[in-house]
Amino acid sequence: MNNSNGSAAPTVMVVEDFEDNRFMMRRLLEMSGYRVLEAVNGQEAIELAHRERPQLILMDLSLPQLDGLAATRRIRQYPALRDVPIVAVSAHDTADFHADALAAGCNDYVTKPIDFDQLEALLRRLLPKNSGQ
């Protein structure tokens, strides 16, 4: 997928176990010109990130099998993925959750329900300037 200016669309990985939430995020991101990868749990996120090298990861913190914090820590162990921005996504909006996400290696934090205008501004800030957006 290319943007209207001909550059490749930035790839965003959505890690979310609830299908309706994944669908909504994918549709909104695709409508904004992003290429979207999807994972349903932390282990799948690690494998997909290692294989596909997304330019940004939206990581739900409450995931089956391997939670988002543990998955983030493991993703950060791969040298090629250390600089990929990871945004924690959670329904919990407390200082402890924010601190835990940052300590695990997340770059930022958004709460559910997601305000897409806020998310879009965050993506523009965190994505590399040459990523096509």
For each predicted feature, which ranges?
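Charged docking surfaces used in two-component/phosphorelay signaling
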Residues: 23-31
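Non-catalytic signal-transmission and effector/linker regions of two-component phosphorelay proteins
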Residues: 1-13, 117-133
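Conserved acidic carboxylate
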Residues: 16
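Active-site beta3 strand of CheY-like receiver
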Residues: 52-58, 63
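The feature encodes the CheY-like receiver
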Residues: 64, 82, 94, 113
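Short hydrophobic/Thr-rich beta-strand motif most characteristic of the beta2 strand and flanking loop
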Residues: 33-40, 48, 110
